[in-house]
Amino acid sequence: MRYGTSADLAASAAECAKVVIAQINPHVPFSYGDALIHVSKLTAAVEVAEPLEELPTAQPSEIDRKIGGYIAELIPDGATLQIGVGGIPNAVLAALGDHKHLGLHTEALTDGVVPLIRSGVIDNSQKKVLPGKNLASLALGSKRLYEYMDYNEDLIMKDVAWTNDPFRIRENPKVM
């Protein structure tokens, strides 16, 4: 079974818990990486078929767009991105369309990275940790993001302790 959008703390929490109850939902995207729990670890499972909660994309303000543009100018081609959630991170992502060979090694996967991945701006060709793969610990976004994730072998979901390990992060070039 897969955790889907939350490889961040789910595995660690399940490992420490005395009781583990899972929701089985066909709307949860199948994800590769650490987002996995064996059925033998479950105390119980409940089937639900409800759409996932969606996080509306924060629309950048005019000031956010200016800040995002300035930040994007500082990001060199071949950099590895760690991106956050909100107006300024979305403005930065929107301003990166002319960049080349960016990598993604981030805790939070958001809607803003999908166009950059699909256009080839984010290709992970310069990364040293999981080269060629997008890396995240959790996904926060829309149905479009969840559809992008589903059975996507180019996206690896890892436990947050692994993803955010500073010794691992520093292996990548030009982390921003």
Feature annotation, model-predicted:
Residues 1-176:
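Conserved phosphate- and dinucleotide-binding cores of soluble alpha/beta proteins
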